[in-house]
A protein has these predicted regions:
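Well-ordered beta-sheet/strand-loop patches within structured domains
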Residues: 67-108, 171, 175-179, 198, ...
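Bacterial N-terminal signal peptides
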Residues: 52-62
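Basic polycationic patches enriched in arginine
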Residues: 27-31, 39-40, 46-49
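Cationic-aromatic interfacial patches
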Residues: 70-202
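Residue-identity detector for glycine
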Residues: 13-15, 28, 35, 54
Length: 607
């Protein structure tokens, strides 16, 4: 009687010698998992003996060469079955709908053979990739999204893999790799799930080809870096994140004692030595001499260190440790680490290439950056303070557009909302209001006198505009990017706003701290527009329109952390609550939300 083939398996326990056993109880389940149906087997010797001699002769002489037997391993059938069902039972996020089509293409091109195993052993590239997945936190990602713990444990098992186990680990690693490359290239959450107006073109990504390349390289980071944002701000933030994770592990050494409600310079506080150590860890205490243990007076470099810390947090740097500063000092790492993770996610939404050097407006930082080169390096950019829309009232939307032209000495065409709700009541109460504030009424495209019947008609066929001049709400120049929100960049006569630390005070538009510098920067490729001509145009009595040689991309972004090349890290308040929204969506886990959020109100009242 024919004997069934025997498979011997390896088993080991702590402190015991390896034991090899025959897995008959698992035999049926493995065939079931692999989709293999057992058949009645006929011993080859009995089959040959049953054939007539003539048939044997024909078999020997008629066939020029024997056909190779097609042997389908159980692991191949299991891979095909799991991908066909788009489900992997060992993974935390078992539904493979997000990566299934790409992985079916990958495995089909390999005849459903293993990607990460060779001779039943994990390859070197596979082990390198598993280490990268385990360190995904250094990229601001969550290693559990990629089942890193399960893969690390699988890679640590001794001996060669059972074919069914091999198939499951192989597919699990492919799933993790596919999810990782997508997260690095596009981010996990769709930007439109947080900002409905933030529409970006989606590049194609050949995931099967990327995984095929990863399977052949022992240095996966080299390939993965090519998917990540090429901008220096992203990489500085990644290095800062790694440093803050290390500091968080040591932060127990710098827990501050109970502090008074307001600690002011010159006061005594027993926790001053600890405060100095904490500020030194954060890079804000610049005195390299040993910290005096007995000095408990809040003065000198300790005060300067607190001021630097406050400035990096977006606070007024007055050196007084009140509620807000004390709260930040009490949680200096964990909350800041999460801010970095959220900001890195936002950087991954950005395009990898720009047609021309862009302008970035970071809303919570109240800063504008106009770049001269495509590398986005700080040594070739123009930076200035800005005023943005008021939180929870007239917020500046997060979106992208292109600057097409500027207007020197512009009119301000008052939006219908402001005209009807603010200007009309004021003009009805005070007939001199319009003249005093340099407003004029326009009907059917022509200016009309500020008579009562026309004032009554404001919002009903009568428009309001403010004539050019230094008093104009748009200042002496505005920069136009046509959009549905009526948001643009402009000058402002209210220069005192730029003295504030927190500058969300507009109706939604971006007020510029140095509009002349931006005009000169954007017209640098038009030599006829000299500094003298630009200043004269800004003081003109009538509007002057100048188109740019090429549209300039503008990104109104929302990053609550910025790292600088000198090692400084600046944290900004979540003024619109967008970080809270993104944090909530990321905590959902796979599948991350990809649908659009509710659109912001439009149009935004300007300026």
């Amino acid at each position: 009687m024919h004997q069934k083939p025997v498979t011997w398996c390896y088993k080991s326990g702590a402190g015991t010698a390896p034991v090899y056993y025959h897995p008959w109880p698992l035999r049926a389940s493995r065939r079931e998992l692999a989709g293999v149906t057992p058949r009645r087997q006929i011993p080859p010797v009995r089959l040959v003996r049953s054939l007539p001699l003539g048939y044997l002769f024909l078999l020997l002489v008629a066939a020029p060469a024997p056909l190779p037997a097609i042997i389908r391993r159980p692991s191949q059938a299991l891979l095909e079955r799991l991908l066909g069902e788009s489900y992997h039972p060992d993974l935390r996020w078992a539904d493979l709908a997000d990566v299934g089509p790409d992985l079916r293409q990958l495995y089909a091109s390999r005849g459903w053979g293993a990607v990460w195993y060779d001779n039943d052993t994990l390859t070197g590239p596979a082990r390198s990739l598993i280490r990268v997945l385990a360190e995904a936190g250094n990229r601001g990602l969550d290693p559990t999204d990629y089942d890193a713990g399960w893969l690390v444990a699988a890679a640590a098992l001794p001996g060669n893999a059972d074919s069914v186990f091999e198939a499951r680990v192989d597919l699990g690693l492919s799933v993790a790799a596919a999810r990782l490359v997508r997260a690095l290239r596009f981010g996990r959450v769709s930007p439109e799930a947080v900002h409905a107006a933030f529409h970006l073109p989606v590049d194609s990504l050949n995931v099967p080809a990327l995984l095929d390349s990863l399977a052949g390289t022992p240095q996966p980071n080299d390939l993965l870096r090519s998917l990540e944002p090429p901008f220096i701000h992203y990489w500085l933030l990644m290095a800062t994140l790694v440093r803050y994770r290390e500091l968080a592990r040591d932060s127990a050494l710098v827990n501050l004692p109970v502090m008074p409600a307001h600690l002011r310079p010159g006061q005594s506080y027993p926790g001053i030595p600890t405060l100095r150590r904490l500020l030194r860890l954060l890079g804000d205490y610049r005195d390299s001499t040993p910290i005096p243990i007995l000095d408990t007076v809040y003065a000198g470099e300790a005060v300067q260190g607190v001021k630097r810390f406050q400035m990096r947090q977006g606070f007024t740097p007055d050196g007084v440790i009140g509620d807000a500063t004390r709260e930040r000092l009490g949680h200096p790492f964990d909350q800041r680490i999460r801010q970095m993770e959220l900001t890195m996610e936002r950087w991954r939404w950005m395009p990898r290439r720009f047609p021309t050097p862009p302008i970035l407006v970071n809303i919570p930082a109240f800063r504008l950056y106009a770049f001269e080169t495509l590398s986005l390096r700080e040594d070739s950019m123009l930076a200035m303070n800005v005023v943005v829309g008021t939180a929870y009232e007239t917020e500046t939307p997060v979106f992208t557009d292109e600057l097409e032209y500027l207007i020197f000495a512009p009119y301000w065409d008052v939006t219908p909302t402001i005209a009807e709700k603010e200007i009309r009541p004021a003009a009805l109460k005070d007939p001199a209001f319009l003249t005093r504030n340099r407003y004029e009424l326009v009907k059917d495209g022509e200016p009309v006198s500020p008579w009562p019947e026309y004032i009554e008609g404001i919002g009903h066929g009568v428009r309001v505009r403010q004539i050019p001049g230094a008093h104009n709400a748009l200042g002496r120049v505005k920069f136009i990017m046509p959009n549905d929100y009526q948001v643009y960049l402009h000058d402002t006569p209210a220069r005192n706003m730029f003295e504030r630390t927190r500058r969300d005070a507009s109706h939604g538009c971006i007020r510029l701290g140095d509009p002349f510098a931006l005009a000169r920067f954007l017209l640098r490729d038009q030599p006829e527009w000299t500094e003298e001509r630009i200043r004269a145009a800004m003081d003109a009595a009538e509007p002057i329109t100048v188109r740019f040689r090429a549209p300039v991309p503008v990104y109104l972004t929302y990053a609550t952390v910025m790292a600088r090349p000198n090692g400084d890290v600046f944290f900004y308040p979540d003024i619109y609550g967008h970080d809270r929204t993104l944090d909530r969506l990321l905590r959902v886990g796979y599948p991350y939300p990809r649908s659009a959020a509710a659109p912001p109100p439009m149009p935004v009242a300007s300026p």
